[in-house]
Regions:
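Sec-dependent N-terminal signal peptides
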Residues: 4-14
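N-terminal, post-signal peptide beta-strand-biased segments of exported outer-membrane/organellar beta-barrel
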Residues: 15-117
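Transmembrane beta-barrel strands of outer-membrane/channel proteins
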Residues: 55-61, 95-99, 178-184, 223, ...
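Outer-membrane beta-barrel strand-turn architecture
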Residues: 83-89, 168-172, 251-256, 316-326, ...
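Extracellular/periplasm-exposed beta-strand and loop segments of Gram-negative cell-envelope proteins
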Residues: 106-113, 127-159, 184-245, 264-311, ...
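Outer-membrane beta-barrel "beta-signal"
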Residues: 540-542, 566-579
Length: 579
């Protein structure tokens, strides 16, 4: 199951590449029904309708996740601008640069099982527990126990977004535009990808040393005894991705309508690498006894691919007059998407066991489990929308729309699975007794298919009040219905028997062929999700240069209006404009 879910998640990520990274508070507070300056600045042809110089910084809160009064945010550096003065006649441009580098300590909880309270903390916790005992009741300490624990749980994220948009008016009714985008992202964490010895899935890294020994210096009559146990889990997962976008657009702009064509190309690479190690070592020095177990899980998932999209939009205008603050329009859009990418996936689990007991008998075991596939994927997608933006009067703007997106991606390729194990037994460490070798191999064709459809219906309302019309209330809702169908199929073309070969010291050999049940899962499921999100906000047009906006006034479960939690949850945006 783990392999299939991972494969399908990459398909979903690829099909949704380059979702918009910045949004205006007008758009967010009306459920996506009404657009603001930021949406226009990102559109290669609508950019030309912006006038003046618009400046964006960290105070603009374009991610809508910063809570200024709580001093809580995404810790990013943001610099952006949109201008109609680009030193070339009839050319307008916008530039956005966003960078973040965040190291986040994660929660740690561990019960050492020694009668003490569980260890708790964040990031890294180091603790040492010690105990002295008198086991023979002669009023002298003769037994020492200690447990030293180092626990780590952290996450690091880096991301850089760069967007350049240019819009040029070729003639009175024709605008050409271009947008370039580059996103580089990286993420690393030290949480286990699967169960390994002491660790469950998503457990944090650990290093635990337990010592138990007799204290002959404290009590000379006690016998010599010393035992050491070390449990260690060192987990590492890193994900890096790079995406480049190029988009060209053209708009034929007439008095009552306009027609726009967008052609977009996206190229991306993604690499996911996991190297998880878990080990346990137990040694009793006085008896020359030890057990050494090591487990290593290595996963590499890489893909590179391309998405090409063609989209057209027809927009009928409700002519702007002095009566309305914003013009209205009815927009119809239809698009087509094709995606192609190559993927390579490998997953190896290596297990080693070395054991010497009190009689110098030795037992060793090495087992390897490998799975891999190479596949090519092709995808087709269709999208369409209809959006009505209508001024009900000189103070009220209504926005309502419907968006539909259907996407299908099919991946086909070859897979291989192998299992190898070797076990040996010795007496007196070097006197070989027997060995057991087990092996099995399977290969075949793999087909992974993902079908997704999303229907979104936003409704938004904006009302300007007070005599000077400097204040506006905004309300919005977004209904979304998402259906996902996931399928996977392994069709073996070769399966060798799972063979067990026993070889004894007298030279005899026994070979057994065991029944084999494939560990590779075939999957087919359908998931339907319905959701409705409500949004709201306030806008204050302080003057022609400064606009202050608020988003998300009330948090869920917060029934009190003016309290500390309410104030700290406010999300504000400051927008600057110069003529």
């Amino acid at each position: 199951m783990r392999r299939i879910i991972l494969c399908l998640s990459i398909i979903l990520i690829t099909s949704l590449a380059f979702a918009q990274n910045f949004n205006s508070f007008r758009n967010l507070s009306t459920g996506g029904a009404l657009q603001g300056e930021v949406e226009k600045a990102f559109d290669p042809v609508d950019l030309y309708s912006l006038n003046g110089i618009h400046l964006f910084s960290g105070l603009s809160n374009l991610s809508a996740n910063d809570k200024i009064f709580a001093n809580d945010g995404e810790s990013y550096f943001l610099l952006g601008a949109a201008s109609d003065k680009v030193f070339i006649k009839n050319l307008k441009g916008s530039l956005f640069f966003k960078f973040s580098d965040v190291q986040s300590p994660k929660a740690i909880t561990y019960n050492p099982g020694i009668g003490t309270t569980p260890l708790t903390g964040e990031g890294q916790v180091h603790s040492k527990w010690e105990m002295y005992k008198d086991t023979n009741n002669n009023d002298l300490y003769d037994r020492y126990e200690s447990k030293t624990m180092t626990l780590k749980n952290s996450e690091e994220k880096q991301k850089m977004d760069l967007f350049l948009v240019l819009s040029h008016k070729l003639r009175d009714d024709l605008v050409m535009g271009y947008r370039f985008g580059y996103i580089n992202a990286g993420e690393s964490k030290n949480a286990a990808r699967q169960e390994m010895q002491l660790a469950d899935m998503d457990s944090h890294s650990y290093d635990i040393v337990t010592i138990l020994k007799n204290l002959q210096d404290f009590d000379p009559i006690i016998s010599q005894y010393e035992k050491t146990n070390r449990e260690k889990g060192d987990f590492s997962t890193e994900n890096t991705s790079n995406k480049i976008q190029n988009q060209i657009a053209a708009m034929l702009d007439r008095e009552k309508w306009d027609l726009s064509i967008y052609l977009r190309n996206e190229y991306g690479t993604d690499k996911d690498i996991t190297d998880d190690k878990a080990s346990s070592y137990e040694e009793e020095l006085s008896a020359d006894y030890y057990i050494d177990k090591n487990e290593n899980f290595i996963l590499k998932d890489e893909y590179k691919g391309m998405i090409n999209q063609l989209f057209g939009r027809f927009r009928y205008k409700f002519l702007e007059t002095k009566r309305f603050r914003y013009p209205g329009n009815l927009a119809l859009g239809l698009g087509f998407r094709h995606s192609f990418f190559k993927s390579n996936y490998t997953e190896d689990t290596i297990y080693e066991h070395d054991d010497i007991d009190f009689l110098d008998d030795r037992y060793t075991r090495i087992a390897t489990d490998k799975y891999s596939y190479d596949a090519d994927a092709n995808g087709l997608g269709f999208m369409g929308n209809v959006v009505l933006t209508y001024p009900l009067n000189d103070r009220t703007m209504l926005g309502v729309g419907m968006f539909c997106d259907i996407n299908k991606v099919k991946r086909e390729g070859d897979y291989a699975f192998s299992y190898d194990a070797e076990t040996s037994s010795f007496t007196d460490v070097s006197d070989w007794q027997y060995s057991t070798i087990a092996y099995q191999y399977e290969k075949g064709d793999i087909t992974l298919e993902d079908i997704s459809s999303t229907l979104s219906v936003p409704v938004g309302l904006e009302y300007w009040f007070t005599n000077n019309m400097k204040w506006a209330m905004r309300f919005g809702s977004m209904f979304k219905r998402t259906m996902k169908i996931e399928k996977s199929l392994h069709e073996p073309t070769l399966i060798t028997p799972r063979t067990v070969q026993d070889e004894w010291a007298d030279g005899s050999v026994d070979i057994t062929h065991l029944p084999y049940v494939s560990e590779l899962e075939n999957l087919s499921n359908t998931k339907v999700i319905n959701s409705t999100d409500l949004s709201y906000g306030i806008c204050y047009q302080a003057n022609k240069n400064l606009k202050i906006e608020l988003l998300g006034m009330f948090e869920k479960g917060n029934t009190e209006l003016w309290n500390t939690d309410f104030i700290q949850s406010l999300k504000l945006s400051f927008s600057l404009k110069f003529d």
